[in-house]
Amino acid sequence: MPRSLKKGPFIDLHLIKKVEAAIASNDRRPIKTWSRRSMILPEMVGLTLAVHNGRQHVPVLVNEEMVGHKLGEFAATRTYRGHAADKKAKKR
């Protein structure tokens, strides 16, 4: 169920401060964040955010289509290595 419109989007205060500082200083370095729950705002378009996936920070270049989504959607936390191969089928 989506968040109520009267509440507005959630974004961590420390992240919005870092974004505003990067915009003011025209800094293009990635902004490192652990806040996967924060929503992407229109002010973040064009910035690179390094989102933590539990092991490392994944660089995410924000574009206009990402506005309204959460940061965690763009940094996968699980790696799928595939199912085990069937040994009987390999011999044929």
UniProtKB/Swiss-Prot annotation:
One GO CC annotation: small ribosomal subunit
GO molecular function: rRNA binding; structural constituent of ribosome
Superkingdom, natural source: Bacteria
A single BP term in Gene Ontology: ribosomal small subunit assembly
Keyword terms, alphabetized: Ribonucleoprotein, Ribosomal protein, RNA-binding, rRNA-binding
A Pfam family of this chain: Ribosomal_S19
Family: Belongs to the universal ribosomal protein uS19 family.
Function: Protein S19 forms a complex with S13 that binds strongly to the 16S ribosomal RNA.
Entry protein name: Small ribosomal subunit protein uS19
Species the sequence originates in: Cellvibrio japonicus (strain Ueda107) (Pseudomonas fluorescens subsp. cellulosa)
